[in-house]
Amino acid sequence: MFQNSRISSGRRRGFTLIELLVVIAIIAVLAALAAYAVIAMMGRQQMRNTESTIKTLNKLLQARWSSVIAEARKEAPSPEVLKLAGGDPERAQVIWVKVRLAEAFPIAYKEMDPLVPTTIVNMYIAPSGRIKSYFTKYRAMVQGKLPGPTESSSCLLMALKTLQTDGGVSFEDQIKYAVADTNGDGMNELVDAWGNPLAFYRFPWNNADLQAANPAAPGSRNFKFSDPIDTGGNLMNPSWAGRPIFEAQFHPVKNIATGNAYFVIPVIVSAGPDQKMDLGADLSVAGAGAADNIFSFKLKLD
């Protein structure tokens, strides 16, 4: 009996059910925390990658945008633009620059349709036969393509690629990681790190953050005439009869609340982590999903 007692006391006590459940619960909590940390780390990396992509694209966009402006300022406006400007040569030159920008950077397939008489190109360039060769290429590339929510992204990709003039690294090689055909329509789009198409706004104006980004000093002449293309305020003249037509076709000119011109620059946007853009056609906020959007004008160029 003494021997049996010694043998019994030497046996290792097993875990109780409660102890096993506690261990399992601890492991589950640690696994959940680890998974959360990994997901959070991936989210931060996706954010950084998207910001890097947008900065790269914006740098390329700004270079091509500036080139189109410089060339347009050397040209004489078309008769149709001069008529819209009410015969004012300075105002006509400002409008002509915006016309050329609309030609170089379309945001919708219909803007390239030769059969739609009300497009900017068909109204103000085509009658004088001065359509740029790259626009003819645009028309061929989008022929038969249907409109949709991704077309501004496809249009920007098409423009940046077609307008490349230097002999360096090809545009596609620079951003091939950010190109995909997300909807299978045969037109590639520029995408963010979450795989969603970026959006491109050519002449946005209705966004408080964008207007606050005006780099000119408050109270200065440049702040009042904050349209970078119309630094003289030619479009703000109240006696200009063609202004309603211009605003309907391009963008509103004057902020009625402040009396200043709108700060109008091209903008590239990602829907961000929640993958909801929630923006109107004028860059206005249309829902809570816009809160985490990533805007090009908020990122400093390297």
What feature does the model see in each segment?
Residues 8-9, 17, 51-54:
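N-terminal compositionally biased, intrinsically disordered segments and leader/signal-like regions
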Residues 20, 28-31, 47, 185, ...:
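A generic helix-loop boundary/linker signal
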